[in-house]
């Protein structure tokens, strides 16, 4: 069979179809995380807040050097359990928050939150820091800011084995309207909670 440039053989088309059907969960939540990072860059560039993503502490165990200039990490482990995703300062207040995303339409799985994260959030609150979670429902295209005290209260009911209903989040949290700049304008809600005007 002769394949002219404008034709694709069936075999290649089938291989491409098989690859495109594969679901990749490795970067789940990355779009939401990217939007938060862009928002934080926006706040930083305008001198509104200094908030950064915390690096995850990793211990590199084995590195492969196929070429001198192309080192490849082959084996690595988390050094310790991470706390929350983001921290920083806004108007002299310490801010600490976690970001979670789900495709579910009616609840946020509590298995996404770990005991050490809940403990850390509790410690931040005890030091009068501002602590919360940003919860994104990707299917619904809805984002909420839920104060950490409300997350902790729900978590303590059953140590995080259930899912948090969207109704609970709507009653105790704050809807964040999508915008172009910043993409996830959560500081507007923080400002209102502090008693200021936006």
Curated annotation (Swiss-Prot):
Mg(2+) binds at residues 83, 85, 98, 117. One of its GO terms (molecular function) is nucleic acid binding. It catalyses: Endonucleolytic cleavage at a junction such as a reciprocal single-stranded crossover between two homologous DNA duplexes (Holliday junction). Keywords: Cytoplasm, DNA damage, DNA recombination, DNA repair, Endonuclease, Hydrolase, Magnesium, Metal-binding, Nuclease. GO terms for biological process: chromosome segregation; DNA recombination; DNA repair. Its EC number is 3.1.21.10. It is found in: Cytoplasm. Binds 1 Mg(2+) ion per subunit. One of its GO terms (cellular component) is cytoplasm. Pfam families: RecU. Its cofactor is Mg(2+). It is an enzyme of class 3 (hydrolase). The record marks 100 as: Transition state stabilizer. It comes from the Bacteria. Belongs to the RecU family. Endonuclease that resolves Holliday junction intermediates in genetic recombination. Cleaves mobile four-strand junctions by introducing symmetrical nicks in paired strands. Promotes annealing of linear ssDNA with homologous dsDNA. Required for DNA repair, homologous recombination and chromosome segregation. This is Holliday junction resolvase RecU. It comes from Streptococcus thermophilus (strain ATCC BAA-250 / LMG 18311). The gene is recU.
